[in-house]
Regions:
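Well-ordered alpha-helical segments within folded domains of soluble proteins
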Residues: 55-72, 115-132, 165-179
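Low-complexity, Ser/Thr/Pro/Gly-enriched N-terminal "stalk/linker" regions
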Residues: 1-59, 77-104, 137
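N-terminal glycine-/serine-/threonine-rich beta1-alpha1-beta2 phosphate-ribose binding loop
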Residues: 63, 97-102, 155-159
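Hydrophobic core segments within long, regular secondary-structure runs in both alpha-
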Residues: 20, 24-27, 64, 80-91, ...
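Asp-box/WD-like beta-propeller blade repeats and closely related beta-sheet repeat scaffolds
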Residues: 106-117, 140-165
Length: 185
């Protein structure tokens, strides 16, 4: 977890809580029945191929976050390998300038359907979750580079105001990237 000197509250770290009974059984069922069976590479392909399809990029980050949390909880070696491989794949997709998007350059930071920043937020969330699990300096660097890249496109003019991105509600869905972007500060 990234902590700042001004933080006063923190989440419990991995391994601080152990469950038993039905809750533990359900967690292990999710690991075996979903997280170990999902093709994470296929989900990363949306970033690799920049097909600009609405909200396709959110799923890698959501599943990566879940996999990292459950990997920390269970200590499952097979799930850890999946998580490590998927993080390496996603970091390999990221361009040197920090771009990690499902949208072609010419359509960023919006995309045809407005989900570009929403999808970047989930990629960032997945990579941050991996950093919290692994302590990988490369993962943290990938996060910082993605935030910096996004900051070149979104903000005060001549950049695009974040309230002019997204698909509804004056950019509220795009603005959800802002909290995660605090790593850049």
């Amino acid at each position: 977890m990234i902590r700042h000197s001004t933080d006063r509250q923190f989440s419990l770290g991995a391994g601080c809580v152990r469950l038993d009974g039905p809750a533990d059984s359900k967690i292990r069922l999710v690991c075996e029945g979903t997280l170990k069976r999902i093709d994470m590479r296929a989900l990363a392909d949306y970033f690799r191929n920049t097909a600009d399809q609405f909200a396709t990029g959110e799923f890698w980050g959501k599943l990566m976050r879940a996999a990292c949390m459950l990997c920390a909880y269970t200590g499952d070696a097979d799930l850890r390998r999946i998580v490590d491989d998927s993080a390496a794949d996603m970091m390999g997709i990221q361009r040197p300038d920090g771009c990690l998007s499902t949208v072609p350059d010419a359509l960023q930071p919006q995309g045809t359907h407005g989900s570009d920043l929403w999808e970047r937020k989930y990629a960032l969330m997945g990579l941050l979750s991996y950093y919290e699990l692994s302590g990988s300096a490369a993962a943290l660097d990938a996060c910082v580079r993605l935030v910096r890249y996004t900051n070149t496109q979104v903000g005060d003019p001549p950049r695009t105001p974040i309230t002019e991105t997204g698909w509804a509600f004056c950019g509220i869905e795009s603005s959800s990237i802002l909290e995660l972007s605090l790593i850049h500060i």
